[in-house]
Protein backbone atom coordinates (compact mmCIF):
# COMPACT_ATOMS: atom_id res chain seq x y z
CA UNK A 1 0.00 0.00 0.00
CA UNK A 2 2.85 2.38 0.89
CA UNK A 3 4.52 1.97 -2.50
CA UNK A 4 1.22 2.69 -4.29
CA UNK A 5 0.84 5.92 -2.30
CA UNK A 6 4.45 6.90 -3.09
CA UNK A 7 3.92 6.14 -6.78
CA UNK A 8 0.68 8.14 -6.99
CA UNK A 9 2.17 11.17 -5.21
CA UNK A 10 5.39 11.19 -7.27
CA UNK A 11 3.56 10.76 -10.59
CA UNK A 12 1.16 13.49 -9.49
CA UNK A 13 4.09 15.86 -8.86
CA UNK A 14 5.46 15.14 -12.35
CA UNK A 15 2.09 15.96 -13.97
CA UNK A 16 1.65 19.02 -11.73
CA UNK A 17 5.05 20.33 -12.86
CA UNK A 18 3.85 19.98 -16.46
CA UNK A 19 0.72 22.03 -15.76
CA UNK A 20 2.77 24.59 -13.83
CA UNK A 21 4.80 25.15 -16.99
CA UNK A 22 1.63 25.97 -18.95
CA UNK A 23 0.48 28.23 -16.08
CA UNK A 24 3.66 30.33 -15.94
CA UNK A 25 3.85 30.65 -19.73
CA UNK A 26 0.18 31.68 -19.98
CA UNK A 27 0.67 34.46 -17.42
CA UNK A 28 3.87 35.52 -19.19
CA UNK A 29 1.95 35.79 -22.49
CA UNK A 30 -0.90 37.70 -20.78
CA UNK A 31 -3.43 34.91 -21.19
CA UNK A 32 -5.82 34.82 -18.26
CA UNK A 33 -5.71 31.64 -16.18
CA UNK A 34 -9.17 31.10 -14.71
CA UNK A 35 -8.24 28.14 -12.51
CA UNK A 36 -5.15 26.29 -11.36
CA UNK A 37 -5.62 23.13 -9.33
CA UNK A 38 -3.25 21.00 -7.32
CA UNK A 39 -4.86 17.57 -7.67
CA UNK A 40 -7.92 16.42 -9.60
CA UNK A 41 -11.54 15.67 -8.79
CA UNK A 42 -13.75 17.35 -6.15
CA UNK A 43 -12.38 20.68 -4.92
CA UNK A 44 -11.50 20.69 -1.21
CA UNK A 45 -10.32 24.28 -0.95
CA UNK A 46 -10.37 27.30 -3.25
CA UNK A 47 -9.04 30.84 -3.03
CA UNK A 48 -9.07 33.54 -5.69
CA UNK A 49 -6.10 35.83 -6.22
CA UNK A 50 -6.49 38.31 -9.05
CA UNK A 51 -8.24 36.60 -11.96
CA UNK A 52 -7.11 33.07 -11.03
CA UNK A 53 -8.90 30.69 -8.68
CA UNK A 54 -6.38 28.42 -6.97
CA UNK A 55 -7.74 25.03 -5.94
CA UNK A 56 -6.75 22.06 -3.85
CA UNK A 57 -8.56 18.97 -5.13
CA UNK A 58 -9.13 15.57 -3.58
CA UNK A 59 -7.16 13.21 -5.84
CA UNK A 60 -3.33 13.65 -5.88
CA UNK A 61 -3.15 12.92 -9.60
CA UNK A 62 -1.33 15.98 -10.88
CA UNK A 63 -3.47 19.03 -11.56
CA UNK A 64 -4.84 21.24 -14.29
CA UNK A 65 -4.53 24.76 -15.68
CA UNK A 66 -7.76 26.26 -17.07
CA UNK A 67 -7.12 29.16 -19.46
CA UNK A 68 -9.64 31.68 -20.72
CA UNK A 69 -10.86 30.88 -24.23
CA UNK A 70 -10.03 27.16 -24.23
CA UNK A 71 -13.71 26.41 -24.86
CA UNK A 72 -13.95 28.92 -27.72
CA UNK A 73 -13.17 26.14 -30.19
CA UNK A 74 -16.34 24.29 -29.11
CA UNK A 75 -18.32 27.54 -29.37
CA UNK A 76 -17.16 27.96 -32.97
CA UNK A 77 -18.32 24.44 -33.80
CA UNK A 78 -21.71 24.86 -32.11
CA UNK A 79 -22.38 28.15 -33.87
CA UNK A 80 -20.83 26.97 -37.17
CA UNK A 81 -18.41 29.89 -37.26
CA UNK A 82 -15.56 30.12 -39.76
CA UNK A 83 -13.17 31.39 -37.08
CA UNK A 84 -12.66 30.72 -33.39
CA UNK A 85 -14.16 33.68 -31.47
CA UNK A 86 -11.64 35.87 -29.69
CA UNK A 87 -12.03 37.87 -26.48
CA UNK A 88 -9.39 39.92 -24.69
CA UNK A 89 -7.11 37.86 -22.46
CA UNK A 90 -8.13 34.56 -24.06
CA UNK A 91 -5.87 31.85 -25.49
CA UNK A 92 -6.81 32.64 -29.10
CA UNK A 93 -6.39 36.39 -28.58
CA UNK A 94 -2.60 35.99 -28.63
CA UNK A 95 -0.57 35.22 -31.73
CA UNK A 96 0.55 31.75 -32.85
CA UNK A 97 4.09 32.25 -31.51
CA UNK A 98 2.81 32.86 -27.98
CA UNK A 99 0.44 29.88 -28.26
CA UNK A 100 3.41 27.76 -29.30
CA UNK A 101 5.28 28.99 -26.24
CA UNK A 102 2.38 28.16 -23.91
CA UNK A 103 2.04 24.66 -25.40
CA UNK A 104 5.81 24.03 -25.27
CA UNK A 105 6.14 25.24 -21.67
CA UNK A 106 4.47 22.11 -20.21
CA UNK A 107 6.91 19.61 -21.75
CA UNK A 108 9.77 22.05 -21.07
CA UNK A 109 8.87 22.05 -17.36
CA UNK A 110 9.13 18.25 -17.37
CA UNK A 111 12.57 18.23 -18.98
CA UNK A 112 13.77 20.91 -16.53
CA UNK A 113 12.49 18.74 -13.69
CA UNK A 114 14.52 15.84 -15.11
CA UNK A 115 17.65 18.01 -15.16
CA UNK A 116 17.06 19.09 -11.55
CA UNK A 117 16.53 15.61 -10.10
CA UNK A 118 19.48 14.17 -12.03
CA UNK A 119 21.65 17.08 -10.89
CA UNK A 120 20.56 16.25 -7.34
CA UNK A 121 21.69 12.63 -7.83
CA UNK A 122 25.07 13.83 -9.09
CA UNK A 123 25.46 16.33 -6.24
CA UNK A 124 24.63 13.83 -3.50
CA UNK A 125 26.55 10.91 -5.00
CA UNK A 126 25.23 7.38 -4.92
CA UNK A 127 25.97 3.74 -4.26
CA UNK A 128 25.59 1.13 -6.99
CA UNK A 129 25.44 -2.57 -6.23
CA UNK A 130 26.71 -4.68 -9.10
CA UNK A 131 28.73 -7.80 -9.84
CA UNK A 132 32.12 -8.34 -11.43
CA UNK A 133 32.96 -8.61 -15.12
CA UNK A 134 32.88 -12.42 -15.30
CA UNK A 135 29.95 -13.81 -17.26
CA UNK A 136 27.88 -16.94 -17.74
CA UNK A 137 26.25 -17.42 -21.18
CA UNK A 138 22.51 -18.10 -21.22
CA UNK A 139 22.85 -20.93 -23.77
CA UNK A 140 24.89 -23.04 -21.33
CA UNK A 141 21.75 -23.45 -19.21
CA UNK A 142 19.10 -23.00 -21.92
CA UNK A 143 19.57 -25.17 -25.00
CA UNK A 144 16.96 -23.18 -26.97
CA UNK A 145 18.93 -19.93 -26.67
CA UNK A 146 20.50 -18.74 -29.92
CA UNK A 147 21.94 -15.44 -28.74
CA UNK A 148 25.14 -13.72 -29.99
CA UNK A 149 26.99 -15.23 -26.99
CA UNK A 150 26.37 -18.70 -28.42
CA UNK A 151 27.23 -17.71 -31.97
CA UNK A 152 30.67 -16.37 -30.98
CA UNK A 153 31.34 -19.15 -28.45
CA UNK A 154 31.47 -17.32 -25.13
CA UNK A 155 32.05 -19.72 -22.24
CA UNK A 156 31.16 -20.02 -18.57
CA UNK A 157 33.58 -17.94 -16.49
CA UNK A 158 34.87 -15.72 -19.32
CA UNK A 159 35.94 -12.28 -18.12
CA UNK A 160 35.12 -9.27 -20.30
CA UNK A 161 37.96 -6.75 -20.01
CA UNK A 162 37.06 -4.21 -22.68
CA UNK A 163 34.28 -3.33 -25.13
CA UNK A 164 35.47 -0.99 -27.86
CA UNK A 165 37.62 1.62 -26.13
CA UNK A 166 35.77 1.28 -22.80
CA UNK A 167 37.45 -0.69 -19.97
CA UNK A 168 35.07 -3.03 -18.13
CA UNK A 169 35.18 -3.53 -14.36
CA UNK A 170 31.61 -4.47 -13.51
CA UNK A 171 28.67 -6.25 -15.10
CA UNK A 172 26.74 -2.95 -15.08
CA UNK A 173 29.41 -1.56 -17.46
CA UNK A 174 28.61 -4.37 -19.90
CA UNK A 175 24.86 -3.79 -19.63
CA UNK A 176 25.17 -0.05 -20.23
CA UNK A 177 27.22 -0.42 -23.41
CA UNK A 178 25.43 -3.44 -24.90
CA UNK A 179 21.92 -2.06 -24.26
CA UNK A 180 22.71 1.06 -26.33
CA UNK A 181 24.28 -0.76 -29.30
CA UNK A 182 21.63 -3.13 -30.64
CA UNK A 183 22.56 -4.55 -34.07
CA UNK A 184 25.91 -2.72 -34.06
CA UNK A 185 29.18 -4.68 -34.08
CA UNK A 186 31.24 -4.26 -30.91
CA UNK A 187 34.86 -5.44 -30.41
CA UNK A 188 35.23 -7.38 -27.13
CA UNK A 189 38.47 -8.22 -25.31
CA UNK A 190 37.95 -11.38 -23.24
CA UNK A 191 40.15 -13.28 -20.80
CA UNK A 192 39.70 -17.06 -20.75
CA UNK A 193 41.88 -19.23 -18.51
CA UNK A 194 44.67 -16.63 -18.56
CA UNK A 195 44.58 -16.07 -22.33
CA UNK A 196 43.36 -12.88 -24.05
CA UNK A 197 40.87 -13.22 -26.90
CA UNK A 198 39.46 -10.66 -29.34
CA UNK A 199 35.94 -11.25 -30.68
CA UNK A 200 33.37 -9.08 -32.43
CA UNK A 201 29.82 -9.37 -31.11
CA UNK A 202 26.72 -7.79 -32.63
CA UNK A 203 24.02 -7.53 -29.93
CA UNK A 204 20.52 -8.63 -30.91
CA UNK A 205 17.65 -6.18 -30.47
CA UNK A 206 15.22 -7.25 -27.76
CA UNK A 207 11.72 -7.17 -29.29
CA UNK A 208 10.12 -6.06 -26.00
CA UNK A 209 12.52 -3.29 -24.91
CA UNK A 210 14.39 -2.37 -28.10
CA UNK A 211 17.67 -2.65 -26.19
CA UNK A 212 20.70 -4.66 -27.21
CA UNK A 213 21.38 -8.06 -25.65
CA UNK A 214 24.12 -10.67 -26.12
CA UNK A 215 22.66 -13.45 -23.96
CA UNK A 216 24.78 -13.46 -20.79
CA UNK A 217 24.19 -13.61 -17.05
CA UNK A 218 26.49 -12.14 -14.43
CA UNK A 219 28.81 -14.73 -12.87
CA UNK A 220 27.88 -14.43 -9.19
CA UNK A 221 30.11 -16.16 -6.61
CA UNK A 222 28.05 -18.13 -4.10
CA UNK A 223 28.68 -15.94 -1.06
CA UNK A 224 25.51 -15.10 0.86
CA UNK A 225 24.89 -11.39 1.57
CA UNK A 226 21.45 -11.79 3.16
CA UNK A 227 18.64 -14.32 3.45
CA UNK A 228 14.90 -13.73 3.24
CA UNK A 229 13.60 -14.15 6.80
CA UNK A 230 10.66 -16.18 5.47
CA UNK A 231 12.52 -18.00 2.68
CA UNK A 232 13.83 -21.53 2.25
CA UNK A 233 17.47 -20.54 2.94
CA UNK A 234 16.56 -19.01 6.30
CA UNK A 235 14.62 -22.11 7.34
CA UNK A 236 17.62 -24.24 6.32
CA UNK A 237 19.87 -22.24 8.66
CA UNK A 238 21.98 -20.36 6.11
CA UNK A 239 23.54 -17.09 7.27
CA UNK A 240 25.28 -14.07 5.70
CA UNK A 241 28.90 -14.75 4.64
CA UNK A 242 28.18 -18.47 4.11
CA UNK A 243 29.70 -19.82 0.90
CA UNK A 244 27.87 -22.62 -0.94
CA UNK A 245 30.29 -25.23 -2.28
CA UNK A 246 28.11 -28.08 -3.53
CA UNK A 247 24.56 -29.33 -4.10
CA UNK A 248 23.97 -32.99 -3.25
CA UNK A 249 27.73 -33.52 -3.53
CA UNK A 250 28.00 -31.83 -6.95
CA UNK A 251 30.33 -28.83 -6.96
CA UNK A 252 28.85 -25.45 -7.93
CA UNK A 253 30.67 -22.18 -8.63
CA UNK A 254 28.11 -19.48 -9.33
CA UNK A 255 24.45 -18.56 -8.84
CA UNK A 256 23.13 -19.40 -12.32
CA UNK A 257 24.73 -22.85 -12.14
CA UNK A 258 23.26 -23.37 -8.65
CA UNK A 259 19.70 -22.47 -9.67
CA UNK A 260 19.92 -24.55 -12.86
CA UNK A 261 21.10 -27.56 -10.84
CA UNK A 262 18.40 -27.15 -8.19
CA UNK A 263 15.78 -27.01 -10.94
CA UNK A 264 16.84 -30.50 -12.12
CA UNK A 265 15.98 -32.12 -8.78
CA UNK A 266 12.52 -33.59 -8.44
CA UNK A 267 12.85 -34.07 -4.69
CA UNK A 268 11.28 -31.75 -2.14
CA UNK A 269 14.63 -30.96 -0.54
CA UNK A 270 18.37 -31.23 -1.17
CA UNK A 271 21.57 -31.05 0.90
CA UNK A 272 23.89 -28.06 0.44
CA UNK A 273 27.57 -28.12 1.38
CA UNK A 274 28.38 -24.77 2.98
CA UNK A 275 31.64 -23.18 4.12
CA UNK A 276 31.24 -21.10 7.30
CA UNK A 277 34.20 -19.64 9.23
CA UNK A 278 36.55 -22.09 7.50
CA UNK A 279 34.48 -25.18 8.38
CA UNK A 280 32.25 -27.28 6.15
CA UNK A 281 28.61 -27.63 7.16
CA UNK A 282 25.64 -29.43 5.64
CA UNK A 283 22.19 -27.86 5.38
CA UNK A 284 19.01 -29.40 3.98
CA UNK A 285 17.05 -26.82 1.99
CA UNK A 286 13.46 -27.16 0.75
CA UNK A 287 12.99 -26.66 -3.00
CA UNK A 288 10.32 -23.97 -3.34
CA UNK A 289 9.17 -23.54 -6.93
CA UNK A 290 7.62 -20.40 -8.43
CA UNK A 291 4.72 -20.43 -10.92
CA UNK A 292 7.11 -20.73 -13.89
CA UNK A 293 8.99 -23.65 -12.34
CA UNK A 294 12.06 -21.70 -11.17
CA UNK A 295 13.55 -22.30 -7.72
CA UNK A 296 13.25 -19.55 -5.10
CA UNK A 297 15.92 -20.06 -2.42
CA UNK A 298 15.48 -16.67 -0.76
CA UNK A 299 19.15 -15.65 -0.96
CA UNK A 300 20.68 -12.29 -1.83
CA UNK A 301 24.21 -12.78 -3.17
CA UNK A 302 27.14 -10.63 -2.15
CA UNK A 303 27.78 -7.88 -4.68
CA UNK A 304 30.33 -5.13 -5.26
CA UNK A 305 29.36 -1.76 -3.83
CA UNK A 306 30.55 1.05 -6.09
CA UNK A 307 30.55 4.44 -4.34
CA UNK A 308 30.08 7.38 -6.70
CA UNK A 309 31.15 10.59 -4.89
CA UNK A 310 29.05 13.75 -5.02
CA UNK A 311 30.03 16.62 -7.31
CA UNK A 312 30.09 20.42 -7.07
CA UNK A 313 27.06 22.55 -7.99
CA UNK A 314 28.17 23.38 -11.53
CA UNK A 315 29.46 19.86 -12.18
CA UNK A 316 26.15 18.39 -11.00
CA UNK A 317 24.17 20.73 -13.28
CA UNK A 318 26.35 19.70 -16.23
CA UNK A 319 25.85 16.04 -15.31
CA UNK A 320 22.09 16.57 -15.03
CA UNK A 321 21.93 18.17 -18.48
CA UNK A 322 24.14 15.48 -20.07
CA UNK A 323 22.15 12.60 -18.58
CA UNK A 324 18.83 14.22 -19.55
CA UNK A 325 20.05 14.62 -23.14
CA UNK A 326 21.15 10.97 -23.15
CA UNK A 327 17.68 9.91 -21.94
CA UNK A 328 16.04 12.08 -24.62
CA UNK A 329 18.11 10.46 -27.36
CA UNK A 330 17.31 6.95 -26.09
CA UNK A 331 13.59 7.79 -25.86
CA UNK A 332 13.51 9.12 -29.43
CA UNK A 333 15.35 6.01 -30.61
CA UNK A 334 12.83 3.88 -28.73
CA UNK A 335 9.93 5.57 -30.54
CA UNK A 336 11.70 4.96 -33.84
CA UNK A 337 12.04 1.27 -32.96
CA UNK A 338 8.24 0.97 -32.79
CA UNK A 339 8.35 1.12 -36.58
CA UNK A 340 11.26 -1.33 -36.90
CA UNK A 341 10.11 -4.55 -35.29
CA UNK A 342 9.69 -3.57 -31.64
CA UNK A 343 6.56 -5.20 -30.21
CA UNK A 344 4.37 -2.12 -29.80
CA UNK A 345 1.80 -3.75 -27.54
CA UNK A 346 4.48 -4.82 -25.05
CA UNK A 347 6.59 -1.67 -25.27
CA UNK A 348 4.21 0.84 -23.68
CA UNK A 349 3.16 1.32 -20.08
CA UNK A 350 0.28 3.28 -18.59
CA UNK A 351 -0.13 5.18 -15.32
CA UNK A 352 -0.97 2.05 -13.29
CA UNK A 353 2.30 0.31 -14.12
CA UNK A 354 4.36 3.51 -13.88
CA UNK A 355 2.86 4.21 -10.44
CA UNK A 356 3.61 0.64 -9.33
CA UNK A 357 7.20 0.76 -10.59
CA UNK A 358 7.88 4.18 -9.00
CA UNK A 359 6.64 2.87 -5.65
CA UNK A 360 8.58 -0.38 -6.05
CA UNK A 361 11.83 1.44 -6.88
CA UNK A 362 11.39 3.79 -3.93
CA UNK A 363 10.49 1.07 -1.44
CA UNK A 364 13.38 -1.24 -2.31
CA UNK A 365 15.88 1.61 -2.54
CA UNK A 366 14.95 3.19 0.80
CA UNK A 367 15.09 -0.21 2.49
CA UNK A 368 18.80 -0.28 1.63
CA UNK A 369 19.60 3.33 2.54
CA UNK A 370 18.09 6.79 2.22
CA UNK A 371 20.71 7.85 -0.36
CA UNK A 372 20.20 4.73 -2.50
CA UNK A 373 16.42 5.12 -2.40
CA UNK A 374 16.56 8.81 -3.28
CA UNK A 375 19.00 8.23 -6.15
CA UNK A 376 17.01 5.38 -7.69
CA UNK A 377 13.72 7.26 -7.30
CA UNK A 378 15.17 10.43 -8.88
CA UNK A 379 16.59 8.50 -11.84
CA UNK A 380 13.26 6.81 -12.57
CA UNK A 381 11.32 10.07 -12.12
CA UNK A 382 13.71 11.72 -14.60
CA UNK A 383 13.00 8.95 -17.10
CA UNK A 384 9.24 9.51 -16.70
CA UNK A 385 9.74 13.28 -17.14
CA UNK A 386 11.76 12.78 -20.32
CA UNK A 387 9.14 10.37 -21.68
CA UNK A 388 6.38 12.95 -21.04
CA UNK A 389 8.53 15.64 -22.68
CA UNK A 390 9.07 13.62 -25.86
CA UNK A 391 5.57 12.11 -26.08
CA UNK A 392 3.80 15.44 -25.54
CA UNK A 393 5.82 17.03 -28.34
CA UNK A 394 4.71 14.46 -30.91
CA UNK A 395 2.72 16.31 -33.62
CA UNK A 396 -0.54 14.59 -32.69
CA UNK A 397 -3.71 16.70 -32.31
CA UNK A 398 -4.89 17.10 -28.67
CA UNK A 399 -1.27 16.79 -27.45
CA UNK A 400 0.95 19.82 -26.90
CA UNK A 401 2.85 18.91 -30.06
CA UNK A 402 -0.39 19.08 -32.04
CA UNK A 403 -1.12 22.58 -30.73
CA UNK A 404 2.40 23.63 -31.70
CA UNK A 405 1.87 22.15 -35.18
CA UNK A 406 -1.41 24.06 -35.64
CA UNK A 407 0.27 27.29 -34.53
CA UNK A 408 3.10 26.67 -37.04
CA UNK A 409 0.59 26.11 -39.86
CA UNK A 410 -1.27 29.28 -38.88
CA UNK A 411 1.99 31.23 -38.80
CA UNK A 412 2.98 29.91 -42.24
CA UNK A 413 -0.47 30.45 -43.84
CA UNK A 414 -0.97 33.83 -42.13
CA UNK A 415 -4.57 32.89 -41.26
CA UNK A 416 -6.34 30.70 -38.73
CA UNK A 417 -7.36 27.11 -39.45
CA UNK A 418 -11.10 26.54 -39.96
CA UNK A 419 -12.71 25.11 -36.78
CA UNK A 420 -14.25 22.23 -38.73
CA UNK A 421 -10.78 21.17 -40.00
CA UNK A 422 -9.44 21.38 -36.45
CA UNK A 423 -12.35 19.25 -35.26
CA UNK A 424 -11.59 16.41 -37.68
CA UNK A 425 -7.87 16.56 -36.94
CA UNK A 426 -8.50 16.49 -33.19
CA UNK A 427 -10.94 13.61 -33.60
CA UNK A 428 -8.24 11.57 -35.37
CA UNK A 429 -5.72 12.56 -32.70
CA UNK A 430 -8.11 11.61 -29.92
CA UNK A 431 -8.76 8.20 -31.53
CA UNK A 432 -5.02 7.56 -31.85
CA UNK A 433 -4.27 8.57 -28.26
CA UNK A 434 -7.26 6.53 -27.02
CA UNK A 435 -5.90 3.46 -28.84
CA UNK A 436 -2.49 3.91 -27.21
CA UNK A 437 -4.14 4.42 -23.82
CA UNK A 438 -6.19 1.22 -24.20
CA UNK A 439 -3.05 -0.76 -25.12
CA UNK A 440 -1.21 0.74 -22.15
CA UNK A 441 -4.14 0.02 -19.82
CA UNK A 442 -4.32 -3.59 -21.04
CA UNK A 443 -0.58 -4.00 -20.46
CA UNK A 444 -0.98 -2.46 -16.99
CA UNK A 445 -3.73 -4.91 -16.07
CA UNK A 446 -1.69 -7.88 -17.30
CA UNK A 447 1.35 -6.60 -15.38
CA UNK A 448 -0.57 -6.18 -12.11
CA UNK A 449 -2.21 -9.61 -12.35
CA UNK A 450 0.95 -11.45 -13.38
From Swiss-Prot:
Locations listed in the record: Cell inner membrane
GO cellular component: plasma membrane
Enzyme Commission number(s): 3.4.24.-
Keywords: Cell inner membrane, Cell membrane, Hydrolase, Membrane, Metal-binding, Metalloprotease, Protease, Transmembrane, Transmembrane helix, Zinc
Enzyme class name: hydrolase
Entry superkingdom: Bacteria
GO MF term set: metal ion binding; metalloendopeptidase activity
Record-annotated membrane-spanning stretches: 102-124, 384-406, 421-443
GO BP field: proteolysis
Membrane topology, record value: Multi-pass membrane protein
Residues involved in Zn(2+) binding: 18, 22
Co-factor(s): Zn(2+)
Annotated catalytic residues: 19
Keyword Mitochondrion appears in the UniProt entry: no
Record flagged with keyword Transport: no
Predominant location: membrane
Domain PDZ, chain residue ranges per copy: 200-278
CDD domains on file: cpPDZ_EcRseP-like, S2P-M50_PDZ_RseP-like
Family: Belongs to the peptidase M50B family.
Protein name: Putative zinc metalloprotease TP_0600
The organism of origin for this protein: Treponema pallidum (strain Nichols)
Amino acid sequence: MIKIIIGVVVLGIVVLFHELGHFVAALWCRVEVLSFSVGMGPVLFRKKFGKTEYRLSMLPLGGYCGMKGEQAFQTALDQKLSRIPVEPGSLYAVGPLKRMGIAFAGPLANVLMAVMVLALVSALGSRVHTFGNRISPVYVYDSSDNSPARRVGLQDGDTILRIGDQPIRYFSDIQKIVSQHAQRALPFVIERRGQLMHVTITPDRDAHTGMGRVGIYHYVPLVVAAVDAHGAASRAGLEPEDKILAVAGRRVQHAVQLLALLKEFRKKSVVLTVLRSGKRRYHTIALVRTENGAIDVGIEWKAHTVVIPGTSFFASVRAGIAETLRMCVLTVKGIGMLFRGLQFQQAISGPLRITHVIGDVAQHGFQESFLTGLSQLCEFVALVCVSLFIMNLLPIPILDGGLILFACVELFMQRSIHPRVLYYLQFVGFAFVALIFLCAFWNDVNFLFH
